[in-house]
A protein has these predicted regions:
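Von Willebrand factor
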Residues: 44-170, 174-176
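N-terminal post-signal-peptidase region of extra-cytosolic proteins
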Residues: 67-74, 157-161, 205-214
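Short, surface-exposed, charged loop/turn segments at secondary-structure junctions
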Residues: 187-202
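Von Willebrand factor type A / integrin I
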Residues: 199-267
């Protein structure tokens, strides 16, 4: 073979190799597909944090409303790229409602995005549009007292655990619950003709946990639950009674396999 022919063949092999490498890289490194509404990766199950606000018979002060805003922003800031944040409220009908359908994965800030595959400015604008405006709407009306005949806290938490995007297949499930923790349904109620002997009136936590598991299964097992225990001076509950309510809940959560932590949420 003449040297010129050899060089030509060698160049063809090199070019073919380069083109093959480029094609392979384009195939392997193509951007993952994102859901346009949630910004979550398609066909992946991300870790999920839910902030649930109790709107039943809870009158939040202006200071508490501002702190709720901060709590949600802190939850947002704690997300790793790809993790999900949702807002829920327990409304006047005793129903859990996905507040303004807000449920968004963190795609990363614009400066964290690879500009070869996605437009950083569009990602940033999309994320801000899906977070800031719905958040502002979600906080509207928090200062209004909503008259509610029931407060199904236990049932609502268990129901969250049965959602497809928050069931036991979801890694690192976390709920931040903002509530006075005053359960009031047929399952059980903290209310009575008088508030004396509260500890004696509350049902056995093991029985409550068993009733929930009979209805919802082990939906809450493994969930990390952070409770912001709302204090309201106008509601007449003494610190001693609030301590009894907290201890009762802690036993229920222990039986359900929930890892709970508590913080006071003063007026």
């Amino acid at each position: 073979m003449r040297s010129k022919d050899f060089i030509g063949l060698f160049n063809l092999v090199v070019v073919a190799g380069v083109l093959g490498a480029i094609s392979y890289a384009a195939l392997v490194l193509q951007p993952a597909e994102y859901d346009p509404e949630t910004l979550c990766l398609v066909d992946e199950t991300p870790p999920h944090t839910i902030v649930m606000i109790d709107r039943t018979e809870v009158l939040y002060t202006p200071a508490q409303a501002r702190r709720i805003h901060d709590v949600i922003h802190d939850a947002r800031a704690s997300l790793e790229i790809g993790e999900r944040l949702s807002l829920f409220e327990l409304n006047h009908r005793g129903e859990i409602r996905n507040t303004n359908r807000f449920s968004v994965c963190n795609p990363g800030r614009g400066d964290q995005i690879n500009p070869l595959y996605r437009n950083p400015n569009r990602v940033q604008m999309r994320y801000e549009a899906l977070f800031d405006r719905p958040l502002d709407r979600a906080l509207d009306g928090l200062l209004d007292l909503i008259d509610s005949p029931i407060t199904p806290l236990a049932e609502s938490l268990a129901e969250l655990g049965t959602r497809e995007d928050f069931d036991r297949a979801v890694p690192r499930r976390r709920i931040i619950l903002i509530s006075d923790m005053l359960q009031n349904t047929q399952l059980y109620s903290v209310y009575g003709y008088a508030r004396v002997d509260l500890a004696g009136r509350l049902p056995d936590p093991a029985i409550i946990a068993r009733e929930l598991e009979n209805r919802y299964g082990r939906a809450l097992a493994g969930v990390e639950l952070e409770i912001l225990f709302v204090a309201q001076d106008h509601d007449g509950w003494t610190p001693q009674q609030r301590a009894v309510i907290r201890a009762h809940w802690e036993e229920i959560f222990r039986h359900l396999g929930v890892r709970d932590s508590w913080r006071e949420f003063p007026e």
